Amino acid sequence: QGEMGEIVIKGHNIMKGYYKKPEATAEAMRNGWFHSGDIGKFDEDGFLYITDRVKDMIIRGGFNVYPREIEEVMVTHPAVSLAAVVGVPDERHGEEVKAYVILKPGQAVTEDELIDWCKGCMAAYKYPRAIEFRDALPMTATGKILKRELR
């Protein structure tokens, strides 16, 4: 309860595998457990909240960094309209935290100002070390950010 982890499911009603995809099946189905790829946590009332995706999680110097958590903080900055956080390769830490940001119309903030602001809102291992400002982010037809195109 309260700790985030991968959601795994077991039962007679769980799929037997992916159609004609044995590698994907072997990756998802381990010892009878279906590994969903979703990260979640239970609240004190027993409700399960999906908080992120395993493949989006950043491992920075041994610490797990959940991009959605950082994105939710960044969009509370008065100048930020939208943020997408990804892990980028880093020799020292394995992965480093990078944010792509769209500013609100008429707003301005520098990379250093936004990084300093983030430092005051989150743990030292979580804040973005690099921020790239963009006019738009790659998205699906349903409005989901295509993070694979940002990595």
Protein language model regions, located:
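General small-molecule cofactor/ligand-binding pocket signal
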Residues: 131-134
